[in-house]
């Protein structure tokens, strides 16, 4: 039993140049674990609260010294001498110490940093990689990447209303081949955009941000890029979209500023159905707003049997919200973001609940990422089968793909690729 001997917090930078929390945990046997917490741009109203300083004299008010102080004082004092191998106890102590339902007193960014760093330290103490420590013998399923190659919405400075357009290499035989195919499509897409006179600068998540005005423009060029790269659209590589509909929802309607169109609930559902009919789309995330329960139910009735419908803002990685959504007939999958809930134990419980209802669980990054690769290990440990971690550029994104490549190599003949599971839907 290795015990927590030291906990240190530090204010560092994320991929957007904003401050975030890094935590280092040292155990009494010398094992060390480190984690850096990401941050989102498009956030759900029911997410756990990240603690910011609100001091305009530092980082335009976005500093995290208060969260770092919570790590170095209250959280450290409460956890010193505790068994690092008892993750549920570690997380329960922190949750009780915070004492708020959304972790606003100490900050979800403080709690999550400690939670993940403890897990890393315990894994090192046991001489195991994190995925094997957390998942045991069943940790052998490599996820299908949902690769965001065209950015819009809150993630880019263009007129596209939808936030993400993704390629999904579900037809690849291995994760390694999935990465290769995706990189080839990414570079083919870059050349096509450049030839057509569009900018090839990239957005927060490493995807391109061309000055398109409608989703169809992005989907058309993606289908063409897949084919030009030598792959079969819908067979080798499919598509996924994230409308981030909560960002479009104004007074009960969906306002598309780029298109200059306003859609009712029924029109929004009909539009998504038309896109799914026309393009090889296998997954739609946040197709309806988090506050539009009737819209979610309608969309699920219309598309749920033939398309993965992922709830992000509507569920916020919370098991209670997920159970409520299942009972109401909303979605058939959940996006899993550790900082939406604030501790590793709660995130694991959410994935357990999802799998219990036969809902898919998609492990996800945030738009403000770091070099931390924990979510790659978590995707394998929890047998999520899918991961969203950005495009084929920017080191904060490719670091996660590189970690998964190493995990696949380490697993050897035990490695499975989850492509068939997604294609079977």
Curated annotation (Swiss-Prot):
Protein name as catalogued: Enolase 2
Reactions listed under catalytic activity: (2R)-2-phosphoglycerate = phosphoenolpyruvate + H2O
Keywords: Cytoplasm, Glycolysis, Lyase, Magnesium, Metal-binding, Secreted
Taxonomic lineage from the root: Bacteria, Pseudomonadati, Pseudomonadota, Betaproteobacteria, Burkholderiales
Pathway(s) it belongs to: Carbohydrate degradation; glycolysis; pyruvate from D-glyceraldehyde 3-phosphate: step 4/5
Localization (cell): Cytoplasm; Secreted; Cell surface
Highest taxon listed in the record's lineage: Bacteria
Family per similarity comment: Belongs to the enolase family.
């Amino acid at each position: 039993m290795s015990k927590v001997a030291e906990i240190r917090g530090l204010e560092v930078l994320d991929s957007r140049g904003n401050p975030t929390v890094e935590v280092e945990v040292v155990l009494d046997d010398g094992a060390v674990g480190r984690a850096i917490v990401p941050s989102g741009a498009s956030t759900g109203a029911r997410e756990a609260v990240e603690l910011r300083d609100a001091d305009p004299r530092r980082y335009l008010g976005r500093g995290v010294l208060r969260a770092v102080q919570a790590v170095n004082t209250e959280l450290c004092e409460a956890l010193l001498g505790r068994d690092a191998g008892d993750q549920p106890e570690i997380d329960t102590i922190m949750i009780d110490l915070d004492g708020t339902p959304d972790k606003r007193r100490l900050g979800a960014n403080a709690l999550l940093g400690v939670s993940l760093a403890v897990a890393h330290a315990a894994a090192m103490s046991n001489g195991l990689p994190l995925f094997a420590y957390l998942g045991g013998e069943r940790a052998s399923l490599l996820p299908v990447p949902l690769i965001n190659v065209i950015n819009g919405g809150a993630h880019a400075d263009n007129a596209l209303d939808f936030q993400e357009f993704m390629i999904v290499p579900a037809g690849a035989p291995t994760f390694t081949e999935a990465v290769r195919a995706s990189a080839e499509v990414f570079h083919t897409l870059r050349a096509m955009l450049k030839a057509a006179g569009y900018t090839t600068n990239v957005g927060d998540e490493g995807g391109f941000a061309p000055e398109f005005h409608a989703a169809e423009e992005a989907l058309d060029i993606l289908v063409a890029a897949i084919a030009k790269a030598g792959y079969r659209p819908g067979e080798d590589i499919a598509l996924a979209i994230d409308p981030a509909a909560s960002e479009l929802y104004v007074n009960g309607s969906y306002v598309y500023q780029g298109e200059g169109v306003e859609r009712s609930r029924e029109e929004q559902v009909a539009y998504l159905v038309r896109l799914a009919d026309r393009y090889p789309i296998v997954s739609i995330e946040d197709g309806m707003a988090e506050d539009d329960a009737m819209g979610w139910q309608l969309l699920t009735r219309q598309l749920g049997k033939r398309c993965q419908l992922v709830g992000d803002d509507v569920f916020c990685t919370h098991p209670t919200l997920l159970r409520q959504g299942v009972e109401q007939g909303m979605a058939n999958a959940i996006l899993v973001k550790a900082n939406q809930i604030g501790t590793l134990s709660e995130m694991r419980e959410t994935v357990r609940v999802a799998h219990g209802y036969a809902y898919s669980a998609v492990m996800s990054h945030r738009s403000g990422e770091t070099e931390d690769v924990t979510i790659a290990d978590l995707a394998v440990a929890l047998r999520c089968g899918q991961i969203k971690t950005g495009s084929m550029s920017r080191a904060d994104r490719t670091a996660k793909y590189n970690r998964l490549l190493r995990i696949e190599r380490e697993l050897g003949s035990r490695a499975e690729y989850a492509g068939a599971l997604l294609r079977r839907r």
